[in-house]
Amino acid sequence: MVTHRRKGGSGPPQKPPPRIVDRSSFDADKKKIKVEKLYHKANNPDNDWPFSFGSVFKMLLSIRISGAIWGIINDCDEVYNYWEPLHLFLYGEGFQTWEYSPVYAIRSYFYIYLHYIPASLFANLFGDTKIVVFTLIRLTIGLFCLLGEYYAFDAICKKINIATGRFFILFSIFSSGMFLASTAFVPSSFCMAITFYILGAYLNENWTAGIFCVAFSTMVGWPFSAVLGLPIVADMLLLKGLRIRFILTSLVIGLCIGGVQVITDSHYFGKTVLAPLNIFLYNVVSGPGPSLYGEEPLSFYIKNLFNNWNIVIFAAPFGFPLSLAYFTKVWMSQDRNVALYQRFAPIILLAVTTAAWLLIFGSQAHKEERFLFPIYPFIAFFAALALDATNRLCLKKLGMDNILSILFILCFAILSASRTYSIHNNYGSHVEIYRSLNAELTNRTNFKNFHDPIRVCVGKEWHRFPSSFFIPQTVSDGKKVEMRFIQSEFRGLLPKPFLKSDKLVEVTRHIPTEMNNLNQEEISRYVDLDSCDYVVDVDMPQSDREPDFRKMEDNWKPVDSLPFIDVSKSTGFHGLLRAFYVPFLSAKHNVMTTCTLYRKSNL
């Protein structure tokens, strides 16, 4: 046995000195100091104060829960192309759009099936309480987005700096656009959530995860989101020289995801289907294209971005130049070689990607709010860069960085809250009225004089139907409940009920009649008003094909009535008082009508 003795002595063995600091912890801290961030050299560590995981998670969770419960559904595509097929998977019935006809097959059942996995668990736990199942699915979507937000936030703190990460997560938390998009059941929202993961993986140089996220977003979500993989592709191929790794990883991941998707979709459609290719061909190459569903000027996106991001949208365009200015200032003493500017490459590539997305979708005639969802993470990121770089370039010298940053975020949060409340106040009743319908059908005990099945009808408000999750399967006496359409001024193609069958694949493989991809009206979709037991309508003056139920008191009586904005008469201050809630002024200048649930008077 070897002992340690004093040099030149024969005394007792020396004990090692007490360990005050754990060596592994010290080594980890040492390594941490050596990490260079965007603006921080090795000898100048980023000692800014960070948000803790707990505080970020709690803030995000509270907002995403609120969005799942109170966020409206502002896109009929979400209902009829996603909620209704999911309802079919869970309860055996729902509405079918032409996109799910095996003739066209431009939607993916694999995407629906991913949501069916947690949804089936909720349905088993809560039985026929379908609104609870609906809310829990939205919350699950929100949680998936939440984890991506935190992953991106953590990567920004590690690779850019803590202040930028802090601003980024605050913008993401308070954004009214994120409030709605984070719990929406549409592929563009799915791609938006994955963009957070892409951003985090890219900054962390986790190439395999980044490629997987881009591939999954592109193939399962929306094929156009392949654009979001531009930074990873350019960095790996042009800057890092990882060509073989990129090609092999992309092939393996693409074949795995594509294989599972093709097998799943082909099973449900009854023929070989690659849905991402079909939707690309329809929109870009051979199909009639989305312009059948309306065209908007470029100002549509400008207004939309302002409504959803208010003052942040003015800061975001300056994120790249201001960040570049401060980066150059910090590193100007170094040799300006290619390696130095490669450190700034992620900012350049992310800026190019954002600009490319805006250019592609801004140039399309058909524009929708959800088309911008996938770049929401980049908007928050570049606005955070702009605010942080402004502080570093000039405000710190004036001693005003903290004050102005707090004021900026406070102003953003107030405007976002104003926008979110305005949306709920003006349009929220189209969901709440169906909660009233659900309560009416669930609590009522006498349905003797009702039709069998009991029929709920909608006319001009067909596009605001929140899905069959709000319609009970049966009532107390066992009668089924169904929703149908009555004629309105709308002249396009409405969805039709899926085929009724005990076997799901028989339903999904069935080729429905009276379907087309030209948005041409099919009269067979309509039922006679006399066959309806309930009607949900927004009360407006009568037109040729739209009755005013308020004046039909002998036949229809209101069960519940909730305020709903009359957009055509609420144009004060160019619609700003409709877009944002301003105490007293919004109530003064906006004109409200009512969204009403009517029941036949003799029932």
From Swiss-Prot:
Where is the segment annotated Disordered? 1-25
Q: Which residues lie on this side of the membrane: Cytoplasmic?
A: 130, 188-195, 240-245, 332-343, 392-397
Q: Which residues cross the membrane?
A: 109-129, 131-151, 167-187, 196-216, 219-239, 246-266, 311-331, 344-364, 371-391, 398-418
Where does this polypeptide localize?
Answer: Endoplasmic reticulum membrane
GO molecular-function annotation terms? Answer: alpha-1,2-mannosyltransferase activity; dol-P-Man:Man(6)GlcNAc(2)-PP-Dol alpha-1,2-mannosyltransferase activity; dol-P-Man:Man(8)GlcNAc(2)-PP-Dol alpha-1,2-mannosyltransferase activity
Q: Known catalysed reaction(s)?
A: an alpha-D-Man-(1->2)-alpha-D-Man-(1->2)-alpha-D-Man-(1->3)-[alpha-D-Man-(1->3)-alpha-D-Man-(1->6)]-beta-D-Man-(1->4)-beta-D-GlcNAc-(1->4)-alpha-D-GlcNAc-diphospho-di-trans,poly-cis-dolichol + a di-trans,poly-cis-dolichyl beta-D-mannosyl phosphate = an alpha-D-Man-(1->2)-alpha-D-Man-(1->2)-alpha-D-Man-(1->3)-[alpha-D-Man-(1->2)-alpha-D-Man-(1->3)-alpha-D-Man-(1->6)]-beta-D-Man-(1->4)-beta-D-GlcNAc-(1->4)-alpha-D-GlcNAc-diphospho-di-trans,poly-cis-dolichol + a di-trans,poly-cis-dolichyl phosphate + H(+); an alpha-D-Man-(1->2)-alpha-D-Man-(1->2)-alpha-D-Man-(1->3)-[alpha-D-Man-(1->2)-alpha-D-Man-(1->3)-[alpha-D-Man-(1->6)]-alpha-D-Man-(1->6)]-beta-D-Man-(1->4)-beta-D-GlcNAc-(1->4)-alpha-D-GlcNAc-diphospho-di-trans,poly-cis-dolichol + a di-trans,poly-cis-dolichyl beta-D-mannosyl phosphate = an alpha-D-Man-(1->2)-alpha-D-Man-(1->2)-alpha-D-Man-(1->3)-[alpha-D-Man-(1->2)-alpha-D-Man-(1->3)-[alpha-D-Man-(1->2)-alpha-D-Man-(1->6)]-alpha-D-Man-(1->6)]-beta-D-Man-(1->4)-beta-D-GlcNAc-(1->4)-alpha-D-GlcNAc-diphospho-di-trans,poly-cis-dolichol + a di-trans,poly-cis-dolichyl phosphate + H(+)
Q: In which pathway does it act?
A: Protein modification; protein glycosylation
Indicate what this protein is called per its UniProt record. Alpha-1,2-mannosyltransferase algn-9
Native organism is Caenorhabditis elegans
